[in-house]
Amino acid sequence: MKTLLLTLVVVTIVCLDLGYTLTCCNQQSSQPKTTTDCADDSCYKKTWKDHRGTRIERGCGCPQVKPGIKLECCKTNECNN
């Protein structure tokens, strides 16, 4: 009986994929690579130019951006590096 209960618990965890998170890069511009675990199902990379040169922002999700900002969204671990 205990074996059956344990089997059901394991099957439930595997089937529900509890706790899955996507790992996205979150370093800014040319900073050393850093990552964060995200509950969102996508990562983003925003690129734009200003008086300091080309700027890059990375993070979780897929935000809306203003005109003139290049946005790349993706759905695999560290895909926004």
Curated annotation (Swiss-Prot):
Family note: Belongs to the three-finger toxin family. Short-chain subfamily. Type I alpha-neurotoxin sub-subfamily.
Disulfide pairs here are: C24-C43, C38-C60, C62-C73, C74-C79
Q: Provide the protein's localization.
A: Secreted
Cross-referenced InterPro entries, in alphabetical order? Snake_3FTx (IPR003571), Snake_toxin-like_sf (IPR045860), Snake_toxin_con_site (IPR018354), Toxin_cobra-type (IPR054131)
Determine the domain of life of the protein's source.
Answer: Eukaryota
> What Gene3D superfamilies does this protein's entry cite?
CD59 (2.10.60.10)
Give the signal peptide, or none.
1-21
> What is this protein's name?
Short neurotoxin D
Q: What does this protein do?
A: Binds to muscle nicotinic acetylcholine receptor (nAChR) and inhibit acetylcholine from binding to the receptor, thereby impairing neuromuscular transmission.
A GO molecular function held by the record? acetylcholine receptor inhibitor activity
Q: Which organism is it from?
A: Aipysurus laevis
Instruction: Identify the GO cellular component terms for this protein.
Output: extracellular region
Going by the UniProt record, its keywords in alphabetical order are: Acetylcholine receptor inhibiting toxin, Disulfide bond, Ion channel impairing toxin, Neurotoxin, Postsynaptic neurotoxin, Secreted, Signal, Toxin
CDD domains in alphabetical order? TFP_snake_toxin
Q: In which tissues is it expressed?
A: Expressed by the venom gland.
